[in-house]
Amino acid sequence: NKIRTYSVIVHEYFHVYQRALSHDKILDRNSPKWLFEGGAKVLEEIYLKQYYKKYLLKNDLKQSDNWSIKRVSKEPKLYEKYNTSPQKKGFDNNYSGSAFIVLALVNELKKNNISEEKAFELVFREFWIQRGKQPQGWNWQPSFQNTFGMTVPEFYERLSKYKRKDLKKIL
């Protein structure tokens, strides 16, 4: 349908934007898949909500048979790479799980007195600029810490405390 086509364009164009900001550092697959795909999925959802009053991610996240919040929150490292991201019943939860992690990151930034708008700017823009300043093959974690003011292990520890009931807080 037309709406789905437009939302896919937003999603894929955002990947072009990420690549441009990071000077193609994404292509070395040394950037976290959850931030790459999750950021694009969240932006796609913002677009759908703003222009079409649709919020597909909310429904996706509520379907516990398609993805496991416990797995996402307890094993986020699995979502760093495409080949380790879990699949459930043939459903590739690159998008749901990754979007959940991104929304949890935004929520954690808000807890640090960062406005929602600024938190999304950090996720959608600043991280990728920081990533672009690093040499090819360089670990993404220093860029994460420089951008978000916490280490990846610190964020994963915070993420580990999220439960299904916390979905309302981040949606």
State where each predicted segment sits.
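Zinc-dependent metallopeptidase catalytic helix centered on the HExxH motif
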Residues: 1-69
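Extracytoplasmic/secreted envelope proteins and their assembly/folding machinery
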Residues: 10-14, 37-44, 99-103, 141, ...
